[in-house]
From Swiss-Prot:
Part of the 50S ribosomal subunit. Contacts protein L29, and trigger factor when it is bound to the ribosome. This is Large ribosomal subunit protein uL23. The keyword Ribonucleoprotein applies. Pfam families: Ribosomal_L23 (PF00276). GO terms for molecular function: rRNA binding; structural constituent of ribosome. GO terms for cellular component: ribonucleoprotein complex; ribosome. Belongs to the universal ribosomal protein uL23 family. One of its GO terms (biological process) is translation. Keywords: Ribonucleoprotein, Ribosomal protein, RNA-binding, rRNA-binding. One of the early assembly proteins it binds 23S rRNA. One of the proteins that surrounds the polypeptide exit tunnel on the outside of the ribosome. Forms the main docking site for trigger factor binding to the ribosome. It comes from Ligilactobacillus salivarius (strain UCC118) (Lactobacillus salivarius). NCBIfam families: PRK05738.2-4.
């Protein structure tokens, strides 16, 4: 799996923005990606050093449109912690 295929998008929430001070970044990743693949992808794309990766699977929520029910897509979220000497990821600074 290519590095650009592993990381789908950054997660921009109030909680994830509060963790930027601790050098913790949150990404939506491919559901088949492992921790080591996520670590390699972040180091390759952003040229930083990763200390650890925490991963969680988020199940889809039930949604209704009139009388029709369905589910949103399940997703996998990764919280990446950078080392102390690593530089910041510029994607989140705006």
């Amino acid at each position: 799996m290519e590095s650009r295929d592993v990381i789908l998008r950054p997660v921009i929430t109030e909680a994830s923005m509060a963790e930027l001070d601790n050098k913790r970044y949150t990404f939506d990743v491919d559901t088949r990606a492992t921790k080591s693949q996520i670590k390699d992808a972040v180091e390759d794309i952003f040229e930083v050093k990763v200390a650890k990766v925490n991963v969680m699977n988020v199940k889809g929520k039930k949604k209704r449109m009139g009388r029709y029910e369905g589910y949103t897509k399940k997703r996998r979220k990764a919280i990446v912690t950078l080392t102390a000497e690593s530089k910041e990821i510029k994607l989140f600074e705006e």
